[in-house]
Amino acid sequence: MTTDTSGRTGAPAAAAPAERFRYGFLKGNPQLTKNGELKHLLTIEGLPRAILNQILDTAEQFVSVTDREVKKVPLLRGKSVFNLFFENSTRTRTTFEIAAKRLSADVINLNINASSTSKGESLLDTINNLSAMHADLFVVRHASSGAPYLIAEHCAPHVHVINAGDGRHAHPTQGLLDMYTIRHYKRDFTKLRVAIVGDILHSRVARSDIHALTTLGVPEVRAIGPRTLLPGGLEQMGVRVFHNLDEGLKDVDVIIMLRLQNERMSGALLPSAQEYFKSWGLTPERLALAAPDAIVMHPGPMNRGVEIDSQVADGPQSVILNQVTFGIAVRMAVMGIVAGTND
């Protein structure tokens, strides 16, 4: 577990090597072609600012598709998108499916529980068989960190892979839609204070957000949470660590709340949900400590009365539902960009 013996506000947290912030599965950057184009989206870490801006700019063009009578563009007509969700999801899978269909792709949702993997077939055998069916794009969610990397390394050359969340490692499209939301409301990343609050240790969203925020030039990123829920390595990326919510929220422009990921916890890291809310829940009173025009975000699913008060979640500074709307456009942008590249 992470510990910090200094007791100072803003002091870095220490952690065992297994809990360090950075992951590394393959050498180099397997996401890019030899021409520097995006072939796969596996993680935000290591991507240049130009590619992040390309995705955000492309997403901006797709936002208006939602308001059309016919909500389709022909960009991926004739392409086959396979949603491979080895881990349960409703929101992410649905938005990927909507995004692919709005790009005119054919979408196949694989029922993992009834698939060959539950009959003993290996992950790579499954991927090879699906590649032989002339799949063009795999959208992969998996409980094991690094699974999308393995698939990208071994799938057929014509197949593109998008990571829809792997273990505690990364959730790049969530990170990108968070960046789109921030840019939509705040415009200039270089003048912001952004706070990420809660279970950062187990959060792949937090990792993706921090990599994106630092790449896009945010001058102050704060990680706020109990000592047991903060990973080591944050300070090496320039992140300020706070163990007091009131102090950490002071004057911030963006607040990203995270749920407790009890399914990824081993052992008793926290007291009850009620006690957690008393110390770490975002209430109207605590929100008042932030900048007057601060926005409140949450990747979902929300646990009201645990990490966030309903008055805040439903209040005028909340942009949580807009994140969901923007997520479709961002995933359209990612699929359109990767499926249009050639190695």
Curated annotation (Swiss-Prot):
EC numbers: 2.1.3.2
InterPro entries tied to this protein: Asp/Orn_carbamoyltranf_P-bd (IPR006132), Asp/Orn_carbamoylTrfase (IPR006130), Asp/Orn_carbamoylTrfase_sf (IPR036901), Asp_carbamoyltransf (IPR002082), Asp_carbamoyltransf_Asp/Orn-bd (IPR006131)
Gene3D superfamilies named in the record: Aspartate/ornithine carbamoyltransferase (3.40.50.1370)
PROSITE patterns reported for this sequence: CARBAMOYLTRANSFERASE
Chain positions recorded as carbamoyl phosphate binding sites: 91-92, 141, 171, 174, 300-301
Entries under Pfam families matching the protein: OTCace (PF00185), OTCace_N (PF02729)
GO molecular function: amino acid binding; aspartate carbamoyltransferase activity
Residues bound to L-aspartate: 119, 204, 259
A single GO cellular-component term on record: cytosol
Pathway per the UniProt entry: Pyrimidine metabolism; UMP biosynthesis via de novo pathway; (S)-dihydroorotate from bicarbonate: step 2/3
UniProt keyword list: Pyrimidine biosynthesis, Transferase
Known catalytic reactions: carbamoyl phosphate + L-aspartate = N-carbamoyl-L-aspartate + phosphate + H(+)
GO BP, sorted A to Z: 'de novo' pyrimidine nucleobase biosynthetic process; 'de novo' UMP biosynthetic process; amino acid metabolic process
Keyword Chloroplast: no
Subunit structure, interactors included: Heterododecamer (2C3:3R2) of six catalytic PyrB chains organized as two trimers (C3), and six regulatory PyrI chains organized as three dimers (R2).
UniProt record similarity statement: Belongs to the aspartate/ornithine carbamoyltransferase superfamily. ATCase family.
Functional summary from the UniProt entry: Catalyzes the condensation of carbamoyl phosphate and aspartate to form carbamoyl aspartate and inorganic phosphate, the committed step in the de novo pyrimidine nucleotide biosynthesis pathway.
Family matches, as NCBIfam families: asp_carb_tr, PRK00856.1
HAMAP family: Asp_carb_tr
Protein name: Aspartate carbamoyltransferase catalytic subunit
Protein's gene: pyrB
